[in-house]
Amino acid sequence: MSVKIQDIRVICTAPEGINLDVVRVETNQPGLYGLGCATFAYRHLTVKHLIEEYLKPLLLGRDAENIEELWQLMHQNGYWRNGPIENNAISGIDMALWDIKGKMANMPLYQLFGGKVREGIPVYRHVDGKDIVEICENIQRFQEMGITHLRCQCGGYGGAPYGQTPGTAPRGAHDGMYLDSRKYIRDTVKLFGEIRDRIGYDMELVHDVHERVAPVEAIKLAKELEPFDLFFLEDPVPLEQTNWLRNMREQTSIPIAQGELFNNPREWKSLIAEQLIDFIRVHISQIGGITPARKLQIFAEQFGVRTAWHGPGDMSPLAHAANIHIDLAAPNFGVQEWSGIEPPNFVIQDLKGPHGALLEVFKGLPEFDKGYVYANDKPGLGVDIDEKEAAKYPCEKTITTWTQTRLRDGSLQTP
């Protein structure tokens, strides 16, 4: 049976107020198609255009079973390689091709990766609050759900809400999320001290710096958080300054997770080979999909680096499912970020889309139960999309504001 690519379409939908790009690859075999995630929420139309105007003509009529060949073809065809636009576009098609292969084999994807080495995937959820009392109340709520790993923040990533320009800013300063990095460090250390005093050490805790402080300040924060036994400190430095991780490794024992913004192998190869990080945190669509993510996972395994794939709200359930399938077969799995795509969802509930709409658009979501996530055993990724429901939630072209982080003097800081 020769399986040829017959059509490629991009479905744009925003059921929870977040722009999602879903790729559908049709084949010449009746009823055989695959779905993948190409979501770059803040540039969704650019990714859609690249897929429909460039990658689709390149791939029509080609053998859908030759995933590696097609990935290399897409990766090299534009000459300049990598980057979030190209990689997300490639990812959508790559995931869809793996979905097709799983359906042809009548197996869930984890079986094609060698089978399960664990039955369920332990996840960490996000807990936030305006003060320590509210944060501890939210921690208790997650404990009752069976969660054993939590990412704790106070007021987001350390800044005031967008538009609240502080009095410390100069005249004429632009709106933004203003960050006082020194106060943020003091408050964060105090936060984890109080959390440990209240709940003890049975809960594994994570904190996301989100690259928002200078590298020397990140080292100071890491050292001061050591007594509170964090599971890891996430993205302490910007991807342009990861050379500072060597200094951090020499000065602190806190486990380091890095890589949310990586989209080029040069950004992670030396960090893993030199064991400067403990967890690799890439967003798999940002590096080109399942094909490169599997290679990265296997590479990291050789150096004792564990996976902790990025799992935010701004990726579709197809990408969440891809994470889970890789996790199930990965000996060096660490923990999985889980933004909570099922009710009760404490992350996306405040967005402008109707709560629960994601469940109407996507079917077959991975199941969360008592701290673990489970893939269903349907062939391929196991997730489908109802296009009629998806059409009810059109994407919007809006200016991204949460990335406009500013320091006290009004200058921009990496988000």
Give residue spans per PLM region.
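Metal- or metallocofactor-binding catalytic centers and their adjacent structured scaffolds
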Residues: 28, 32-105, 414
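Ligand-binding pocket scaffold of soluble enzyme catalytic domains
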Residues: 8, 20, 30, 35, ...
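Conserved, mostly hydrophobic/aromatic
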Residues: 5, 31, 55, 93, ...
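Metal-dependent enolase-superfamily TIM-barrel catalytic cores that perform enediolate-based chemistry
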Residues: 120-247
